[in-house]
Amino acid sequence: MTARLTRRPGGPARLRALLDSGQTIVAPGAFDPLSARLVEEAGFPAVYMTGFGTSAALIGRPDVGLLTMTEMAGHAGRIAACVDIPLIADADTGYGNPLNVIRTVGAYEAAGAAGIHIEDQVAPKKCGHMEGKLVIPAEEMVQKVRAAVQARAQPDFVIIARTDARAVEGLERALQRARMYHQAGADALFIEALTSEAEAEAAVRAFPGVPLLFNWAEGGKTPPISLDRVKELGYRIVIFPISTLLAATGAMRRILREIAQAGTPAAAMSELPTFAEFVDFIGLPQVREAEQRYAVGTGPRTGSQTGADDGGDI
């Protein structure tokens, strides 16, 4: 993997091609650009921008609907700009009614996301594995999905409809809602917080040929089913939204404890990348190359390049 200074175009088309290939897309969660780069370095075909992790990273607060659409789309743009793999992003409830959803789709597309999921929770929403969720009427969500599908400028931009109704209305009603959302034009479905492997299997059986997303969340309501089994069941997208966030939190706690107790992180240095390795990873060689390429005096100078239109000094 080589660090880029600009975003690679065509994310929606590449995500659509992955969906059309029949393979299961494994997309670990990223909570910032650095974690997204690590997902890419590990060889995954796509990355997922976690709303839970974004809320924790940006404002240090839980995922309870505190972030705005512009904050979320802006964060998606920063992540998309630093990786070559497609970005699937959490777009919460779409941030309002169908008119708001139209603006949301445009903002995430402009940011460089390859696809988004929107959910049928009442705003302000909660993390899908928290208690106390409420859902809007299914017919209202249908209009949001229709608006999202019709608003996208790129036909390949992937719209994933998520239902949180399992925890509120039960599995059968959640499946009914998901069917309505698919009929409204959603490209894929996300039935959140299933409570057993049997429910996960039932969801796939209910939608033959329709891409379904499986949410593998540590400590959540869905049991820890192996990735091989999730693939065997037929899920087409698998996200691990908080794995990197929890791992980073644990690692930072360990190093901070070492500094607090020993006065130095020396005991943990063998587990850390070196400074040189880290700056190479985040793209310093590419920055240096660009500095040399565009350094003053390395190429012909014209009035327009120097800012002078008469050949004089500026």
Model-derived features: positions:
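Alpha/beta enzyme core
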Residues: 6-18, 25-214, 220-235
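Short glycine-enriched loop/turn motifs at secondary-structure junctions
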Residues: 20-22, 241
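C-terminal alpha-helical cap/extension of soluble enzyme domains
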Residues: 216-303, 307-314
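A general structural signal for well-ordered secondary-structure junctions
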Residues: 24-25, 265
